[in-house]
């Protein structure tokens, strides 16, 4: 198929070091290599995370892990078993900017590029946008210290969130999810890519 690209790579070996070294002005940053993906997959909200969204959540979480912090990612299952990233918000000073300024606008742009968007008028595109936001899984590479990202997700129509948890204020985000009927999963493992 013309849509498949095969790449040949050398032998893939397991990482030999547990540390990552980054040169910065005036020194070097040494941090542990991020080798795990998640410690758990625990729904912490009243709204249960549907089984049919778990693979999409794992895909979105894996992409989120490899996205520069502070990362917000929205993954979408465009046909059964086939996933794509609709929006990605990397490298911002806070997650709300990653969400509102980068990720959500990219989702809206990409909705217009979906095959089912062809020939739709403005109202049809808006309806498709709402459908996509209702079906994406939103991932965050670290916990939410405030419920603002849950509120922003709800305002867009997002119903599923995956994040590590671990904030002293997790209960505020959980309460907002419960208020809005959003299902949220905690992975127990955060990922920072700086």
Predicted features along the sequence, with ranges:
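ATP-dependent carboxylate/acyl-activation modules
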Residues: 1-194
């Amino acid at each position: 198929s013309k849509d498949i690209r095969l790449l040949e790579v050398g032998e893939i070996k397991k990482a030999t070091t547990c540390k990552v070294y980054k040169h910065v002005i005036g020194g070097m940053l040494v941090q542990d290599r991020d080798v795990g993906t998640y410690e758990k997959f625990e729904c912490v909200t009243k709204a249960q995370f549907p089984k049919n969204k778990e693979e999409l959540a794992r895909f979105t979480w894996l992409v989120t892990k490899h996205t520069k912090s502070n990362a917000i990612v929205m993954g979408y299952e465009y046909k059964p078993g086939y996933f794509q990233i609709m929006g990605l918000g990397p490298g911002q000073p806070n997650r709300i900017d990653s969400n509102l300024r980068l990720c959500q606008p990219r989702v809206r742009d990409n909705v217009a590029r979906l095959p089912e968007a062809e020939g739709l008028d403005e109202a049809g595109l808006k309806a498709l946008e709402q459908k996509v936001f209702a079906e994406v899984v939103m991932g965050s590479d670290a916990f939410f210290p405030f419920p603002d990202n849950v509120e922003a997700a709800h305002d867009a129509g997002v119903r599923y969130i995956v994040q590590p948890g671990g904030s002293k204020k997790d209960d505020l985000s959980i309460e907002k999810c419960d208020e809005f009927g959003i299902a949220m999963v905690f992975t127990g493992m955060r990922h920072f890519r700086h």
